[in-house]
């Protein structure tokens, strides 16, 4: 086992603070509308330019092991905030740095770190209550667009697009962000349930120009196993032909004789039919087939449930207003499932999302939820160069998360104002002892840090701006860094999602509290590499002393 270095007390905290400062100073230049860019070197290709705090934090790795521990703890603040709220990473970093700095001074002055932490926690709880109390619900599309615009660093086109996407797919719908292949940024909305399986054979196409199959008011057979022979389902096919309606078969696969028979019938015009493979794999496939069955009001034909193909009747099949199939995707529009059944299924999936600990599973469950509850919207981000597209995509991602957060918990005045105003609530707070009071004062000073940093990045004096804002008793009054003016921020559309501000403060206080109460640090001692061995001496070669 490699030897370890151990640092104690002030020395440990001092090194950790250096790491915190290096990371925070690189991240905080991006804060606010006048925030600067940070250029990140890539091992191959062009460097990446970003104003996204968490992207900067993730790139920083320091040579000194102890400094690096401090930087990594601060990086954890940014990524945790990003995971929960999707935005506010720079605010969280600025808050954490301010709390750690002040806390470090207090511990150096001989105060009890545990009491400091208790004071910090008490003050944070009061501030969070204050934020919740003053949060204003987002109701109109215009308000939604404003939140998106602020998070996209003032680009109103992005805000509008996110607002439109949320209107179309609802708050449960999935909105994904992709890179476009051209200059324009565009929004694509898929209504109904879409899954990534196309027709099994091109002979099922009904529109040869577009190479798509469109079925109006079809029956839908949802079969779990492979179909190799149609013999067991002949009675069902006859019933479908007599009804005069098309049939869509969703099965694990359709091959051999079954596929040939279906194609021949389709070409002769006796049967309007199409077949697609079931989406997903393994257990996820079963769940998705069940989703389709609930959406279309049908049943999954599965031997596990004791249902055989021979016994299937028309009322076991699902129906929908329209099914659109192309080479890669199938879309079921307006399924005939009962609203209560769909609601029940949505509730069940939501419960699974709450329980799961895997990010991948959560993402897949959310996709299923969206397909049942709303729809899927895709924002394709364009730009003139690859670097620009990547930078804009970062901003669209941030804006999307911020907008979702605003719909969940409402909005507060932006520009760091809501946190700065919360300091007024901490003035008369009662603490058990003086050390705890100092902990509360640390939070009181730290809450002004984001407002001061936004002003500083805009070329103003942060302390002067903060005092001017707090002198005015109007809750929505603050500093518009973009225009360099004081105004009613909510009316001007400068707003932050309450969830983002709350999460940033909670995560910053949590990690900063841990750093303040650290008394020892252990890191691996770097091994000294042995000097490369020299060649043998050149003895015996006399006469070379000129």
Curated annotation (Swiss-Prot):
Coiled coil: none
Region (Disordered): 527-546
Catalytic activity: ATP + H2O + a folded polypeptide = ADP + phosphate + an unfolded polypeptide
Annotated residues for binding of ATP: 30-33, 51, 87-91, 415, 496
GO biological process: protein refolding
Gene Ontology molecular functions: ATP binding; ATP-dependent protein folding chaperone; isomerase activity; unfolded protein binding
Record key words, sorted: ATP-binding, Chaperone, Cytoplasm, Isomerase, Nucleotide-binding
Compartments reported by the entry: Cytoplasm
Bias-annotated ranges (Gly residues): 536-546
InterPro entries membership: Chaperonin_Cpn60_CS, Cpn60/GroEL, Cpn60/GroEL/TCP-1, GroEL-like_apical_dom_sf, GROEL-like_equatorial_sf, TCP-1-like_intermed_sf
First-tier enzyme category under EC: isomerase
CDD domains associated with the record: GroEL
An example Gene Ontology CC term for this record: cytoplasm
EC number(s) on file: 5.6.1.7
Domain of life according to the entry: Bacteria
Main location class: cytoplasm
Family in the record: Belongs to the chaperonin (HSP60) family.
NCBIfam families: GroEL (TIGR02348), PRK00013.1 (NF000592), PRK12849.1 (NF009487), PRK12850.1 (NF009488), PRK12851.1 (NF009489)
Protein role: Together with its co-chaperonin GroES, plays an essential role in assisting protein folding. The GroEL-GroES system forms a nano-cage that allows encapsulation of the non-native substrate proteins and provides a physical environment optimized to promote and accelerate protein folding.
Subunit note: Forms a cylinder of 14 subunits composed of two heptameric rings stacked back-to-back. Interacts with the co-chaperonin GroES.
HAMAP family named in the record: CH60
Protein name: Chaperonin GroEL
Gene name as annotated: groEL
